[in-house]
Amino acid sequence: MNQVGLVGRFTKDPVLRYLSGNRVQTHFSLAINRNFKNIHGEVDTDFIFCTVWGRLAEHIVKYCGKGSLIGANGRIQTRSFVNEENTKIFMTEVVVEDVRFYQLKQRDSDDASIVTPPPPNEQKDLKDFVLP
């Protein structure tokens, strides 16, 4: 079984990417505080890279900005690619399949005021979650 649940804040505004075959995708990092203090008495933060596809990606880009607090459920995925220096890079990320909006902040807003989250979607369109 490959399942993960996260609650964290966006480190920056997510950006929607349009790919071939009418697919849309966004990726972002969530800042997640650990639930204990280190030997210096400080709380460490993990930065988890996440990827989202389809309508869910569109909703995230529309409603979430830097500092928004969300809950994300999905699966861990590893992949590799060759960068511009011809070095093979390995990456571990969470492919998000479900999101709960807890505290949303407007995108590109100086005062980062909270906005109302969209109503929960009772029926999922599973074709949006098919990966290439």
What are these regions (language model features)?
Residues 1, 18-21, 43, 101-132:
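Acidic, gly/ser/pro-rich intrinsically disordered tails
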Residues 93:
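Short aromatic/basic micro-patch
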Residues 17, 37-39, 59, 83, ...:
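Intrinsically disordered, low-complexity acidic/polar segments
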Residues 13, 33-35, 97-107:
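Activation segment
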Residues 4-45, 80, 90:
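Core FKBP-type peptidyl-prolyl cis-trans isomerase
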Residues 5-10, 30, 66-78, 96-99:
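OB-fold and OB-like beta-barrel modules that bind single-stranded nucleic acids
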